[in-house]
Amino acid sequence: MKASELHQKDQAALNKELSDLLKAQFGLRMQLATQQLTNTSQLKKVRRDIARVRTVLTEKANQK
């Protein structure tokens, strides 16, 4: 997800997106631990998406 798309969302939508990404990250970590994950680059993508969402949330909080 691009940062420009995240800037257009409100804080509630960003929190939901963050929650979904954290659940996805947990699932991927479990798959990695049980050696079921074949595409390990998904972990990196999800981790970076989480960082993007948290950055936008912080920016919105500091604007107020």
From Swiss-Prot:
InterPro entries xrefs: Ribosomal_protein_uL29 (IPR050063), Ribosomal_uL29 (IPR001854), Ribosomal_uL29_CS (IPR018254), Ribosomal_uL29_sf (IPR036049)
Protein name: Large ribosomal subunit protein uL29
Keywords: Ribonucleoprotein, Ribosomal protein
Domain of life: Bacteria
Example of a GO biological process term: translation
Gene: rpmC
GO molecular function, one term: structural constituent of ribosome
Family per similarity comment: Belongs to the universal ribosomal protein uL29 family.
PROSITE patterns with a match to the protein in the record: RIBOSOMAL_L29
Gene Ontology CC, one term: cytosolic large ribosomal subunit
Listed transmembrane segments: none
Organism: Paraburkholderia xenovorans (strain LB400)
The UniProt record lists the keyword Transmembrane: no
Pfam families: Ribosomal_L29
HAMAP family: Ribosomal_uL29 (MF_00374)
